[in-house]
Amino acid sequence: MMYKQISHLEAWELVKKRDIVIADVRDQDSYEEEHIANALHLSMAKLQEYSEKADKEKPVLVYCYHGISSQSVAQHLVEQGFKEVYSLIGGFETWKAHHPTSDANKN
């Protein structure tokens, strides 16, 4: 199985309509400054632990800065048995240009 690359519009619909895990794989400071609402910070150090403990049936949307690093993380999650994994094309920068964001104080 492969992960699917999706546009910010597809991601927006997915986030609005489904119970989905949103995984931010950028650095901690960037995450704390601003992120997609309800995203969890998934550093490379936390990735293996997450892969072992998370519900693999629940869809996961992975994003990074520009949509490059998220692809390798998405592929890793698929290889770990996650059934439905998405990578955000254009990453957080594209999301931010079109949709609301949140910060550490707001969630």
UniProtKB/Swiss-Prot annotation:
Keywords: Cytoplasm, Transferase. Its EC number is 2.8.1.1. It holds the Pfam family Rhodanese. It is found in: Cytoplasm. The keyword Transferase applies. NCBIfam families: PRK00162.1. This is Thiosulfate sulfurtransferase GlpE. It comes from Coxiella burnetii (strain RSA 493 / Nine Mile phase I). The lineage of its organism: Bacteria, Pseudomonadati, Pseudomonadota, Gammaproteobacteria, Legionellales.
